[in-house]
């Protein structure tokens, strides 16, 4: 897969998916425990999640971001146990 980059007529929309706060996160707990073992004592907790970078044609206006939000709700996140956010970063 080629790296996502800003090009003429192409935009990127970012979807971040996290477990809901009330859902147990064993992977995050394992990472936090490893941080302690490795000497990173300032780390109190970790929640693990997923990040999707979706490349779309054209600008990432409100309508396009709304379509990606619908995609996230239907395909990228499990609404029973996960919450998500969608945003279009500013091009560099």
Residue ranges and their predicted role:
Residues 1-92:
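Non-catalytic terminal accessory/regulatory regions of metabolic enzymes
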């Amino acid at each position: 897969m080629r790296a996502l980059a800003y090009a003429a007529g192409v935009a990127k929309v970012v979807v971040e998916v996290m477990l809901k706060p009330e859902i147990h996160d064993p992977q995050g707990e394992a990472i936090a425990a490893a941080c302690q073992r490795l000497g990173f004592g300032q780390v109190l907790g970790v929640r693990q999640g997923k990040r999707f970078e979706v490349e779309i044609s054209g600008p990432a206006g409100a309508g396009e971001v709304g379509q990606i939000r619908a995609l996230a709700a239907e395909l990228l996140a499990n609404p029973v146990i996960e919450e998500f956010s969608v945003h279009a970063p500013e091009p560099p």
